[in-house]
Amino acid sequence: MEERYLELDRSRKNDFLYPFIFREYIYTFAHDHSLNRSILLENVGYDNKSSLLIVKRLITRMYQQNHLIISANDSNQNLFFRYNKNLYYQMISEGFAVIVEIPFSLRLVSSLDLERSEIVKSHKLRSIHSIFPFLEDKFPHLNYVSDILIPYPIHLEKLVQTLRYWVKDPSSLHLLRLFLHEYWNLNSLIIPKKFITIFIKRNPRFFLFLYNSHVYEYESIFFFLRNQSFHLRSIFLRVLLERIFFYGKIEHFAEVFANDFQAILWLFKDPFMHYVRYQGKSILASKDRPFLMKKWKYYLVNLCQCHFYVWFQPEKIYINSLSKHSLNFLGYLSNVQLNPLVVRSQMLENSFIIDKDSTMKKLDTIVPIIPLIGSLAKTKFCNAVGHPISKPIRADSADSDIIDRFVRICRNLSHYYSGSSKKKSLYRIKYILRLSCVKTLARKHKSTVRAFLKRLGSELLEEFFTEEEQILSLIFPKVSSSSRRLYRGRVWYLDIISINDLANHE
């Protein structure tokens, strides 16, 4: 092992991001980015008040007043935040998130140094679905899994301190403290949960950046210990903190184990330990006995609590068998199923047949129908028990706009849940959306559903079929067994980079 793996990357230590805050194109870029993101439903939280005129007014106010020096006494008297506080705060936070991501992107590109085709491949790994082929390949060979809820840091100043290792710009960090000061009192020890919820809804990109940068710091140390203990080096991992003292402690730790605890050295050499983080949770999975899982669980908990002041609850972290426990993972219920197989061998010379029963492990991904119906009921597509209802609309809405809206939601859900191993629940969701669309149109035209369908014909329902379903219906006859198997097969897409409440049932 070499110490350079624990040194801070100082190749771009002169990054000065503060002047970008006063550039109009930064806010335009942030606005376009939030508008063009891939979503499953509608971006109902999008603020239509964003415009270039408001950006210019915002920048003018930032130039005219000194907002970077603030005390607890005069914060309530600051005219900048008293005037349209929430809108200006949201715009600056989105612009700040775009700006502060610049050094992250530059370090990523310079560290990878890949060919163009490999860069395209790495972009595909951003897709949410890219994790499921990995799970299909690895999880059937594993036995135990632990689902860990990652808590928020107990103090917002910890988020700023983490960012200091990335951004060498005191002005930008001071502005960040000002933003956080306006939402919470930095002298408080605990972040109120209701304020976290409000902050996430109003500034999703800004919060996710701060949260991910903080989580990545302790994950980098966790991965470093894991990779070094297996004598493997990850080319995609760059530890960005100076942890020479920590490195020395690790060497001493390994030396003590070698001298006094030789019998359990295998604990740190298990090649089947896997770590996956998604949203606010992480997964530890292993092939070996639960003893190994307990050791790594307590190491992760102690590392986060002692060095990063993130409070875990070890008693609520359970180690479960993959064959008996389902993971609520990115909108899917995933577990490992034992599928029975029959192997038939026939000897031609002696003319006898040998039948052998066997089992094969397979990752099973199911659409959680009850949470999905709850999401549809919350957005007024059906009632609490799943019966489709008409959705209230404006009287001047065109029929084509209403149909396009329902079709877009239905196709996006079909696109996201195309990896389900059982399509029955997905068919029910499509049925709810189709009938809700018909009832909405019939209500607008003051007609019954039967009369409206009779007048419109079956063309309306054909709009709800996805492009993949239309292609399969043209290539294969529906009566053929090969068509049914292909149509029911799992398909993972590499162009889905975000989800909304219909897929996020947490």
UniProtKB/Swiss-Prot annotation:
GO terms of molecular function: RNA binding
Keyword hit for Hydrolase: no
Taxonomy, superkingdom: Eukaryota
Keywords: Chloroplast, mRNA processing, Plastid, RNA-binding, tRNA processing
GO biological process, one term: mRNA processing
InterPro entries with a match to the protein in the record: Domain_X, Maturase_MatK, Maturase_MatK_N
GO cellular component: a single term: chloroplast
Compartments reported by the entry: Plastid, Chloroplast
One Pfam short name: Intron_maturas2
Family classification: Belongs to the intron maturase 2 family. MatK subfamily.
Protein's job: Usually encoded in the trnK tRNA gene intron. Probably assists in splicing its own and other chloroplast group II introns.
Protein name: Maturase K
Source organism of this protein record: Manihot esculenta
Source taxonomy: Eukaryota, Viridiplantae, Streptophyta, Embryophyta, Tracheophyta
